[in-house]
Design a protein with these regions (language model features):
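Alpha-helical interface subdomain recognition
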Residues: 3-177
């Protein structure tokens, strides 16, 4: 009895609290990896030419780069909001579940796009992209698979609407309370 941390039956809640901060750290790692993948892609497309034109000057390539930049930006804002709430000691469960799914899928998409922009070089071992691509797949499984987090998030959206008549509290609530 003297070795019990917290109160009896509080172990799961304590574990969830620890996971909240771990997920924040994982999220920051995902953003950094996505940013590096986009940097590698940018370095490649500005020097690579096809049919007499730089890849960087092609509209489709620019759209791909823009989409990656937008995803990284959304991820950063999401993490800043979660970090703010963590600093204030606020409940992070809903935001962490949303972010866990979004960030794992975001880094997967950005690294995949970087590989695509590199062509066969991106899938070789001459860049870190192929190794990252296989490693980041686990992000959608660890700390609970995407489907579990989506199920919980969806349930919270319904619950918020039934309780408050709006889904806002299940979508991050007030950005800075």
């Amino acid at each position: 009895r003297e070795n019990i941390l917290g109160g009896r039956g509080q172990g799961f809640n304590m574990g969830q609290h620890r996971l909240a901060y771990g997920r924040l750290r994982h999220g920051m790692h995902n953003v950094a990896m996505a940013q590096r993948a986009l940097d590698l892609a940018a370095a490649h497309v500005v020097q690579r030419e096809t049919f007499g034109k730089r890849l960087a000057d092609r509209q489709g390539v620019r759209w791909m780069m823009a989409d990656c930049a937008a995803e990284i930006y959304k991820a950063r804002l999401m993490l800043l909001h979660i970090a703010y709430k963590a600093e204030k000691g606020m409940d992070l469960r809903q935001e962490n579940g949303i972010a866990k799914v979004f960030l794992a899928n975001m880094v997967h998409q950005v690294v995949d796009t970087a590989i695509q922009l590199h062509g066969a070089l991106g899938y070789s071992h001459d860049t870190p992209l192929a190794r990252w691509y296989t490693g980041i797949r686990s992000q959608r499984l660890v700390d609970g698979p995407d489907e579990v987090h989506r199920w919980r998030t969806g349930a919270n959206v319904i619950k918020a609407f039934e309780k408050y008549g709006t889904t806002a509290s299940a979508c991050g609530g007030e950005l800075f309370e």
